[in-house]
């Protein structure tokens, strides 16, 4: 876990310090280790990941159960003492991270991607660029459980 957590902190800092990938407290990253999902805390900056504790441990099984019930408001930090010490709360995108099968998930807000996404012909533009890649276009939905469900159903 220590090496993986160090890798998470390092890549989070790298992308958090690149204005083309992340602006302010936007974007989030996560690491899955056994039944724990370490996800960036709400309101924290990825660029602070080396010098500050910005990750929150949550129970992956609980997140999955809450996704099924459409209610992430019941999500609690896995280690209550951890939350009391650091006053951190999981990102609104915790469900999205839990649904992804990958050990590491990097959810960024790349300026170039966003500028294409808002174009009236953005989807057609992306179709030309990614014709040999398996991908999905998700029309805008609110962040959180709605986005996670849209991705899950795509």
Predicted features, each with a name:
Residues 1-154:
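Glycine-rich flexible loops
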